[in-house]
Swiss-Prot record:
HAMAP family: RfcS (MF_01509). InterPro entries: AAA+_ATPase, ATPase_AAA_core, DNA_pol3_clamp-load_cplx_C, DNA_Rep/Repair_Clamp_Loader, P-loop_NTPase, Rep_factor-C_ssu_arc, Rep_factorC_C, RFC_lid. ATP binds at residues 43-50. Signal peptide: none annotated. This is Replication factor C small subunit. One of its GO terms (biological process) is DNA-templated DNA replication. It comes from Methanococcus maripaludis (strain DSM 14266 / JCM 13030 / NBRC 101832 / S2 / LL).
Length: 315
């Protein structure tokens, strides 16, 4: 069975990691000196936090990386018992081979409960001579200050377009795909700097055809073309509510889009609309209200229709 491409093409070493050049430079320095503090990786999903941690371990330990590296997902195992058992048991044993210390990687550590984080802080202190921790999170504000102060913090930003393009072209070449310019642009649009999402969309599109076109990408990603969203919003802004609502229903039915997905794309189009700054402010406010109501459980079609109606009377 074929591996997911995100795993098949995951970088094995720090030198292979795409983007984040300054971060990779500092991590490589830790490997060369065989010395590092506890680390905190923060950033949105799919930007390379886990990949960087795995590559660091492989560069640091070589063939014994599996024995000296423990990876846990804190969103699945978020209670204090995990810290007291799995983490503590691994942290207090000596490293294998000539490794200076072991590494424990806690993915999505912002999901740890407050009690678990306090227990983790004590474990970090107690075993700091033979163990280092790498914490990965989406929201660093959810990590308690005593842990943050013990870590060197690395902020992973969304990947740049050129980094995404380079990697997508490389994978396409290895998989014998014809990645068209429109297909690349579409993947860049739907992934928003998320390399994992970009590769997953590419693999899904490749299951449909070896010719990766704009149309296929938007279809498999269940996203509308930006011009489809712009057409709908422009109709609404021009007071053509019925036509705008018809376009909305087409997006929801033909493209299988959720109300939340459509709302996010409308929000992304706001800066490009030919309306005044004041009208853009009022529109963003209306989008925020619509988003809140949908999250609270209101009917998506009714709320999005109400948003389109408001667009026609913006002041």
């Amino acid at each position: 069975m074929q591996k997911p491409w995100v795993e098949k093409y995951r970088p094995e070493t720090l030198s292979e990691v795409v983007g984040h050049h300054e971060i990779i430079k500092r991590l490589t320095n830790y490997v060369e000196k065989k010395s590092m503090p506890h680390l905190l990786f923060s950033g949105s999903p799919g930007v390379g936090k886990t990949t960087a941690a795995l590559a660091l371990a492989k560069d640091l330990y070589g063939d014994t990386w599996r024995e000296n590296f423990l990876e846990l997902n804190s969103s699945d195992e978020r209670g204090i018992d995990v810290i007291r058992t799995k983490v503590k048991d691994f942290a207090r044993t000596k490293p294998i081979g000539d490794a200076p210390f072991k590494v424990i990687f806690l993915d999505e550590s912002d999901a740890l409960t407050s009690d678990a984080q306090n227990a983790l802080r004590r474990t970090m202190e107690k075993y700091s001579d033979i163990c280092r921790f790498i914490l990965s999170c989406n929201y660093p504000s959810k990590i308690i200050p005593p842990i943050q102060s013990r870590c060197a913090i690395f902020r992973f930003s969304p990947l740049k377009t050129e980094d995404l393009v380079e990697n997508l072209k490389d994978i396409s070449e290895k998989e014998n795909l014809n990645l068209e310019k429109g297909g690349i642009d579409a993947i860049i649009y739907v992934s928003e700097g998320d390399m994992r999402k970009a590769i997953n969309v590419l693999q899904t599109a490749a299951a449909v055809s070896d010719e990766i076109t704009e149309e296929i990408v938007y279809k498999v990603a269940s996203k509308a073309r930006p011009d489809e969203i712009k057409k709908m919003t422009q109709l609404a802004l021009n007071g053509k509510f019925v036509e705008a609502r018809e376009q909305l229903y087409n997006l929801m039915i033909d493209w299988g889009m959720s109300g939340e997905d459509i709302l996010i794309q409308v929000f992304r189009e706001v800066p490009n609309l030919d309306i005044s700054e004041k009208e853009k402010v009022h529109l963003v406010e209306a989008i925020g209200e619509c988003d809140f109501r949908i999250v609270e459980g209101s009917n998506e079609r009714i709320q999005l229709s109400a948003l389109l109606a408001k667009m026609g009377i913006l002041e």
